[in-house]
C-alpha cells in the first residue's frame, strides 16, 4: 500500500474514531456485552460437564474467541449507512485511494476489538482466571484472536456490501451466530451428539479457541491446533477480502 493510500486510510480511521467521541454508547455496549455474556455463562452454566479443570479456565479463552466472532453489526451498519446515505459517492468524487473507506473502518474495528480483549481479560483476572503460559505464548494467543477477528471482519464487510441497507444487517448478522455457538467456546464437543460434535470440531472458531487455551496454558487443553488457527483465518481472508474489495469497486462505479 502506497503512502498516499495509507494517508487516506488513516483519515478514514480518524473519522470512525471521531464518531466514537460523538456516539460513545455503541462503543460502551460493544465493550460491556462480552462481559455480560461471560458473567452469564460463567455463573449460570458454571458447572459445565466434561471439562477438565475449572469451567472458568475453559470458558474465558472460549469467550475471548466468541467475542472476536460477534459484534460485527457496528461495522456492518456503518458500511451500509454510508452506502445508503451516499457518503461513498461523495468520497468517490474526492482524490481518495480506492478502498480507503473500508480499510479505515476495519482499522477502527480492530482497535475496538483489542480494547474488548483487554476488558475481558481484565474481568477474567478479577474473577480469578490466570494465564499459565509465558509472555510469548500469551502474545501469540492474542495474535490468533485478532487474526480471527480480522477474518470475521472482512466477512462482515462483504455481507454488509451485499445487504446494501442498514435494515438488512440484522438479518444478515444472524448468519454469523452459528459460527459462534456451534463451536467449543462454551462446551466440549465430546459432550454433544456425534453429528453436532463433528460440526463443532470443523468450525474455524473451535481451532482458534482450542489453540488459545493451549497457549494460555489452560489445564487439560488440547494441543496441536495453532497451525489450523492460523490457516483457517488466512484462508477466509483470501476469499472474503478480494470479494469485499471487488464488491465495493462495483458499488462505487
From Swiss-Prot:
Keywords: Antibiotic resistance, Cell membrane, Membrane, Transmembrane, Transmembrane helix
Inactivation phenotype: Deletion of the drrA3-drrB3 operon decreases by 79% the daunorubicin (DNR) titer in cell culture. The drrA2-drrB2 mutant is more sensitive to DNR. Deletion of the drrA1-drrB1, drrA2-drrB2 and drrA3-drrB3 operons almost blocks DNR production in cell culture, suggesting that disruption of these operons impairs the efflux of DNR, resulting in intracellular accumulation.
Transmembrane region(s): 27-47, 59-79, 109-129, 142-162, 168-188, 225-245
Domain called ABC transmembrane type-2: residue spans: 25-251
Disulfide bonds: none
Single GO biological process annotation from the record: response to antibiotic
Topological category with respect to the lipid bilayer: Multi-pass membrane protein
Induction and repression of expression: Exhibits high expression level.
Keyword Transmembrane: yes
Pfam families: ABC2_membrane
Keyword Acyltransferase tagged: no
InterPro entries xrefs: ABC2_TM, ABC2_TM_bact-type, ABC_2_transport, Nod_factor_ABC_transporter
PROSITE patterns linked: ABC_TM2 (PS51012)
Subcellular location: Cell membrane
Taxonomic superkingdom: Bacteria
GO MF annotation terms: ABC-type transporter activity
GO cellular component: ATP-binding cassette (ABC) transporter complex
Principal location: membrane
Family classification: Belongs to the ABC-2 integral membrane protein family.
Function: Part of the ABC transporter complex DrrA3B3 involved in daunorubicin efflux. Responsible for the translocation of the substrate across the membrane. Confers self-resistance to daunorubicin, an antibiotic produced by S.coeruleorubidus. The efficiency of DrrA3B3 to export daunorubicin is probably lower than that of DrrA1B1 or DrrA2B2.
Subunit annotation: The complex is probably composed of two ATP-binding proteins (DrrA3) and two transmembrane proteins (DrrB3).
Protein name as annotated: Daunorubicin resistance ABC transporter permease protein DrrB3
